[in-house]
Amino acid sequence: MDSTTKLAIGAIGIVFGDIGTSPLYAFRETFVGPNPLPIDYNHVLGVVSLIFWSMTLIVAIQYVTILMRADNKGQGGSLALVALISRSVRNTNYGWLVVLLGVFATSLFYGDSMITPAISVLSAVEGLVVVDPELQGFVIPIALVLLVGLFVLQKRGTAKVGALFAPVMIVYFTVIATLGLISIVQHPEILYALNPYYAVLFFINDGFLAFLALGSVVLAVTGSEALYSDMGHFGRGPMKLSWFGFVMPCLLLNYFGQGAMIVSLSGPEAQEAIQAPFFLLAPEMLRLPLVILATFATFIASQAVISGAFSITHQAIQLGFVPRLSVRHTSDAHSGQIYIPVINWALMVAVILLVLTFQNSSNLASAYGIAVTGAVTIDTLLMAVLLVGVWKWKWYYAAPVVIVFLIIDGAYFAANLTKVPDGGWFPLVVGLIVFTLLTTWARGRKLMRERMSEVALPIEIFAKSAHNSATRVPGTAIFMASSTAGVPSALLHNIKHNKVLHERVVILTVEISDIPYVDPAKRCEYSEIGQGIYRAILHYGFMEETNVPEGLKSMQQCGGEFDMMQTSFFLSRQTLLPSDKPGMPIWREKIFAWMLRNAATAMEFFGLPTNRVVELGSQVRI
């Protein structure tokens, strides 16, 4: 088995869980949701046709074929796309708008990562009611136990159970495809839905009701943005192979199978079957095993979304949109497997509240969709900038492509906006809160750097004056600096209060690049300023762990050498003071100050040895 096939199999277990569990509720919701459709031949074929063409246009063409070509050194996702585009449009008038769009798409993802575990696990456990209606009262308790267990297990990492993900998902996809195929063979007339005529006829006959149905049909493509975000783990080739060669055919067979079953029924029988078409495809004796298999699949889908939240948060920290948080690496073999406690517990609380508030997957479906369609629409806008600004397409080639996708994505987003009163407000509120936090932190850090640079002493002047103004003591002192310009405040405070300078003083800056990984040969820079004072820079990509002691080992190739037992680290801890200077509104200053107080220490974030760290306070007015 070649490496591409192995990676494709691995991707089936990790990447496609979200979109793979959509058949549990997507088709059903068009007929039982807030705007239910009448159950008849034309409506069933219209919905199945819409699902087929939505999956083809949005997932297969927009994401897998076009956007997956837009990788930032192998990484995908909104933030990676923004970093890629920013290098080409940084000095243009719309560069700031590109960044804001990418940050808002990322903010919407957090709302999605709260809803996905709740709706996925609930929809699977609700299958118990199909097996035995008397189990209705156990659905929410079982779902809550499973979800709490999922979040509690996060700190142990997924390395041990991750090997089971691909086999379970392969069995799951094979089973749902087989059940769908059996139903299609029994009622092959459902295959007429391959013809877009039935989707068009649906809109001609039903107009606004068909438009509202888009809000439920879009549930079939939830998880498409996650495919792009997870591209860095497996690569474009293996993911295209697994999507076109296995996942997409399996999903379509199941959707067409559900449609075939409903088409064959009428009246009360159809009304009863539409409540759980996914589970009713299976013979009665196999429904309980299908419930168990679907529960495992939703567990894996939820795991993928939670891991995605950790990964995106880590990227946002490195790119300067989120304060330093405690990031724990759960695998020595895979640097991408991380655990962020504060994100984990915040997601768990939100998911529990969602389950208790909405009570069932059908109610939750109303909240689902806005975050996904919002992110997809933003990705389409970013794609327009990518085609013209980065790939240098002529506008008359790019315009038709972008317009087609904007019409499709915009229609889905508009249809989902009608669900705001029924629960769609939730991901929007989460997105706005997260967007406010991310932009407040980025703006506050920018203002802090500007204020500190205004009063910073040039390093050359400091080196000349320090030679005669302080007693030199043995050893090496490393002063962490956020900028390569000027003297760090911790160094000035050390001179002011302690009146000493170490024999070797190193001003160290950690710089995060807008690429995921930095070539180890370009990791460090090391130069002498004079009077025993040196400038050192460590370069990292936004996907890498910023472990300074490990990074200092690479300094040997740049001319520096460090003995940790003879080295002390000096850090500055800033305190904000109110200021009359124009910067941010007071309410945002208070939010920024709160985020600054609760951020992880530089000692923890950079992996510094606790017994070798000295922290000095400083005050900043923004």
From Swiss-Prot:
It is a multi-pass membrane protein. One of its GO terms (molecular function) is symporter activity. The keyword Hydrolase does not apply. Keywords: Cell inner membrane, Cell membrane, Ion transport, Membrane, Potassium, Potassium transport, Symport, Transmembrane, Transmembrane helix, Transport. The chain crosses the membrane at residues 7-27, 44-64, 95-115, 133-153, 165-185, 199-219, 243-263, 290-310, 338-358, 370-390, 395-415, 422-442. This is Probable potassium transport system protein Kup. GO terms for cellular component: plasma membrane. Transport of potassium into the cell. Likely operates as a K(+):H(+) symporter. It is found in: Cell inner membrane. PANTHER family: LOW AFFINITY POTASSIUM TRANSPORT SYSTEM PROTEIN KUP, OSMOTIC STRESS POTASSIUM TRANSPORTER. Belongs to the HAK/KUP transporter (TC 2.A.72) family. It catalyses: K(+)(in) + H(+)(in) = K(+)(out) + H(+)(out). Signal peptide: none annotated. Pfam families: K_trans (PF02705), K_trans_C (PF22776).
